[in-house]
Amino acid sequence: WLGRYGFLRSEGQATVGDVLRGKTGAVPPFVHTHPTETVRDAIDILREFGVSQMPVVRAEPPVMAAEVVGSVVERALLDDLFNGRAQLADAVDAHMSPALPMVGAGEPVQAAVDALHDADAVIVLEDGKPEGVVTRQDLLGYLTA
């Protein structure tokens, strides 16, 4: 439990936090949206930062893990929009996907690899607070750096 929420650090091996800190580029570490924002707003955020998924949180960061209420995934939004199940003016909470898996910053990189088996991204927690998002692309970048 302590490791999963980022309170403990694995000794002697690369950690998920190392991957997060090694990310390059101009993307803020915790791109997010809120349940009351519109689908259009969420799409604008996805496009602005060039990400394909992001957490939905109840408050402005810093937030605790329990305040992550879901995620926005471009694939799901595109499907809902094209099939008439969503409108651009709808609130995000009506179309959000389940929350992204969470891994502790101090956990070994393998924990992120395992979590990414069934998800496109994971939220990295440090002391119980979401600090950022790591994707498969981030892991590949870390491994080749």
PLM features: what roles do these ranges have?
Residues 1-145:
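Tandem CBS (Cystathionine beta-synthase) repeat/Bateman regulatory domains
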